[in-house]
Regions:
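C-terminus-biased signal that marks the final domain/tail of proteins
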Residues: 1-143
């Protein structure tokens, strides 16, 4: 997460990296180098060490390295909700709740506005039976 939001603040690669996955002194938080977007939050919460030897879904590295460290974006993460507040917008559309079902590494976020009183059937009628007729189950079937 810090590597993605702060790619230039620290040295992240090589034998002289400031931090490695086994460092005991990784900062709890850092100020990001740029303003964080909704897409940045989604990417971080979907992260699974992609592009590294530790990626549990990737093909690089050996079997002992892949999945060695627990990533955020694993298939057991079932739901994401993000509130976006936009003070520069009219009040009735200034807040958006972004919702995503199923594993964050494989899902997509859908915007919901608080002022909207109805939701399309595909998004609202989940049902207890698995079906591709609704967004919830379609998302769950991907992962």
């Amino acid at each position: 997460m810090e590597r993605y939001l702060n790619p230039n603040t620290k040295k992240w690669d090589g034998p002289d990296a400031d931090y490695t996955p086994e460092s005991d002194d990784i900062p709890w938080c850092m100020e990001p180098e740029k303003k964080i977007t909704v897409e940045d939050v989604k990417y971080v919460l979907s992260s699974h060490y992609q592009g590294t030897i530790y990626d549990p879904y990737g093909g690089s590295g050996d079997g002992l390295q892949r999945g060695r460290y627990r990533s955020i974006g694993i298939n057991r993460n079932d739901f994401l909700s993000l509130i976006q507040m936009r003070p520069d917008q009219p009040e009735d559309v200034s807040v958006i709740q972004w919702i995503a079902f199923a594993s964050n590494a494989f899902n997509v976020m859908v915007p919901f506005y608080p002022g909207v009183s109805t939701t399309p059937e595909y998004l609202s009628n989940t049902g207890k039976d698995v079906s591709t007729d609704n967004f919830y189950w379609s998302s769950r079937l991907v992962a």
